[in-house]
Amino acid sequence: MTSKLNLDPKVIDSARTSAAHIAQSMQEFIDKHTTVSTERTILRLLGIDGVDDVERPLPNVIVDAVKDAGGLPRGVAYWIGNAILRTGKKPQEIAEAIGRGELDLMKLEQGSAEAAAKAIEPYVNKALEHIRRQTEKRNEYLTTIGEGRRPYLYVIVATGNIYEDVIQAQAAARQGADIIAVIRTTAQSLLDYVPYGPTTEGFGGTYATQENFRIMRKALDEVGEEIGRYIRLCNYSSGLCMPEIAAMGALERLDVMLNDALYGILFRDINMQRTLVDQYFSRIINGFAGIIINTGEDNYLTTADAVEEAHTVLASQFINEQFALRAGLPEEQMGLGH
């Protein structure tokens, strides 16, 4: 069979092989390292949420305390598991006690890693089961009420006020939109924490928070049932809190995520090593939750000539594909370029 584009399969295979070498060399680094955002994500998946009395997210409070005491290389899951054994409290109760200054994880008697892992196992399983149920709910909607014709119509809302976004999103769905993307407020990708609760003020977009995800998901389910068509929800899993937003999206049944470390490196000056570690964990989560990812090559073409710099886009797409495969993301969930 002749390709419609008359592309040379040997050149494509060669490019994939080169990209695989690049991704694998980085993967060896990724497998040996963690980041503060990856550790905060683990806390969120253990059910820890909320803020302390000065509005600091509890995952940040815990990870910062563990990091300052030199305990982060052991992994925050160990410290929470050990605290469960020593105090008899649940992860959320432990987090709240830390937030009030009543508990220091590092001063507790330290047990074995195996015992700590066993202590957190019920909470891990609870999170996984919740995400599985959300995936099943999506599939149930697609089976019962169906979806729009392809290609999907993609509409952006970005008022800064999640409640105004809901009105616009439902109106767009009634007019034929298949995917609603809620653009994040300007520079949220450079915040090293995820804001808490519903938000009504933003700049050029709306804050990505778990409560905002929940509000919009509920609204799109309602309008989807009304018009007889499942409406997908898209947000942005990139920047300094990439895996945290992926976890929040998995818990609240988002369907599509912009998910790319490379444009964060090129356009946001984000630490290369950190963001590639974060990307790996975020893509594991997206893969498990059935979330489609789109990468960020379109950003390159906002600053350069599309023809002259086409090779940079192709290189990024090949590398992104290989990183996604190493995270276990099915090809059906890979969207290259946005």
Tell what function each PLM region has:
Residues 1-163, 171-176, 187-215, 237-257, ...:
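Long, compositionally biased, glycine/small-hydrophobic-enriched stretches that function as flexible linkers
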Residues 182-184:
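Active-site/pore-lining binding-face segments in mid-to-C-terminal subdomains
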Residues 218-235:
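A glycine-rich, acidic short-motif signal
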Residues 226-230, 327-334:
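Flexible, glycine/charged-enriched surface loops at secondary-structure junctions
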Residues 321:
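Ligand/cofactor-recognition surfaces for anionic moieties
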